[in-house]
Amino acid sequence: MENTTRTWVFPKLDTRQFVLLAMLMALHMVLSRLTVGTNVLQVSFAFVTMSLIAKWYGPLWSMLIAAILDVIGATIINPGAFFVGFTFTAMISALIYSLAYFKHDKTSWWRVSVAVGLVLLIANIGLNSIWLVMMYHTAHDWPSFLAFITPRVIKNLIMFPIQVGISYFLLNNQVISHTTKKIFS
């Protein structure tokens, strides 16, 4: 029996993989800026690019890229809005997507639903709400916290089937499968 030790290292990227990653990063920056809503409640489709990065590059690359994209977005594109908690949230979301999608040729409805549900619950409703309360001091007692979080829960309940549908279609698309075979094989 062969002794195989799984270590957490950054896999080397060839030129095509690196260029694809750069293109996905650029697309992510565009999609993350095309939001609807307020500072407290926003709808964005940046999860699309992060899902692809997680599927193709794995947990370490996707977490690093999520952190880089968050820092670039908060300091260069939208100066003055940086908070390290949101960077941590982006990394946790990337990790969840990677654990669900990386090294899976076909991604089931169940796997996509669990991944999206965990990201929406842990990252969007949980961590991001905590960071916003810390930043804006909006909830000083339980009733004000419930008033603050209720629209966030409703927004994420609405976004859940939308994100699951888009993610499932995207991750199981023939073009994506062909790209995976061509660039990552």
Curated annotation (Swiss-Prot):
Membrane topology: Multi-pass membrane protein
Keyword Ion transport set for record: no
Gene3D superfamilies per the UniProt record, alphabetical: 1.10.1760.20
Subcellular location: Cell membrane
Entry superkingdom: Bacteria
Molecular function per GO: folic acid binding; transmembrane transporter activity
Record key words, sorted: Cell membrane, Folate-binding, Membrane, Transmembrane, Transmembrane helix, Transport
CC per GO annotation: plasma membrane
Cystine connections: none
InterPro entries: ECF_S_folate_fam, ECF_trnsprt_substrate-spec
Function: Folate-binding protein that interacts with the energy-coupling factor (ECF) ABC-transporter complex. Unlike classic ABC transporters this ECF transporter provides the energy necessary to transport a number of different substrates. The substrates themselves are bound by transmembrane, not extracytoplasmic soluble proteins. Upon coexpression with EcfA1A2T in E.coli allows 5-formyltetrahydrofolate uptake; uptake requires both FolT and EcfA1A2T.
Binding partners and assembly: In E.coli forms a stable energy-coupling factor (ECF) transporter complex probably composed of a membrane-embedded substrate-binding protein (S component), two ATP-binding proteins (A components) and a transmembrane protein (T component).
Protein name in UniProt: Folate transporter FolT
Organism ancestry: Bacteria, Bacillati, Bacillota, Bacilli, Lactobacillales
